[in-house]
Amino acid sequence: MSFNLGKSLTKLIIASNNDGKIEEFIQLLSGIPLVVMGQPKHLEVEETGVSFAENARIKAIAVAKATGEMALADDSGLSVGSLGGAPGVFSARYANTDLERVSRLLKELEMVDDRSAFFSAALCLASSKGEVLLELDGRCDGIITTTPRGKFGFGYDPIFEVKGTGLTFSEMDSKQKRELSHRGLAVKKLIPSLKKILDS
């Protein structure tokens, strides 16, 4: 992306080692004059919070302090009503791989009629000094399908059918997913405030 502003662009570090998530943020923030990149590969931040918002805050502050750059963290996950909100904050740790996580969830819902679920995303933006600048969230409702569908996306995307669309995230192109996803909705709220911060 190239913006000729007569000055160097601000870096924004995405507090994640998940390549799929980083790429999604690069696309979501493509209209803003920023250099968006993932955190250093060696950097690991332990998610010790009990909520998405708390984990996002922990990650944003840690990555900002470690890199000396502005950092944006997202903690997101899938909550299934009939499983008491699981996997919730443990979505990424529900099993070792995306395939295993999807398989485990489908197995747990084998005999369950109520398959309603929602994705939540909590965002936290921290300054280069590690101060919290913004905290926002987004939510997308849907149901868990009985089998994986589609070839795009990552994580639970193949088994999450977005309410009112008849499509899983994995069946959507990236533009449609950006418009409807929990992360896309949260970033939409973030952008006006982020622009003000960059202009100040």
Curated annotation (Swiss-Prot):
InterPro entries the record matches: dITP/XTP_pyrophosphatase, ITPase-like_fam, RdgB/HAM1
Cofactor note: Binds 1 Mg(2+) ion per subunit.
Pfam families linked to this entry: Ham1p_like
Record-level GO BP terms: nucleotide metabolic process; purine nucleoside triphosphate catabolic process
Gene3D superfamilies linked: 3.90.950.10
Keywords: Hydrolase, Magnesium, Metal-binding, Nucleotide metabolism, Nucleotide-binding
Active site: 75 (proton acceptor)
Cofactor: Mg(2+)
UniProt: Mg(2+) binding residues: 46, 75
Cellular component GO terms held in the UniProt record: cytosol
Role noted for this protein: Pyrophosphatase that catalyzes the hydrolysis of nucleoside triphosphates to their monophosphate derivatives, with a high preference for the non-canonical purine nucleotides XTP (xanthosine triphosphate), dITP (deoxyinosine triphosphate) and ITP. Seems to function as a house-cleaning enzyme that removes non-canonical purine nucleotides from the nucleotide pool, thus preventing their incorporation into DNA/RNA and avoiding chromosomal lesions.
Assembly: Homodimer.
Protein name: dITP/XTP pyrophosphatase
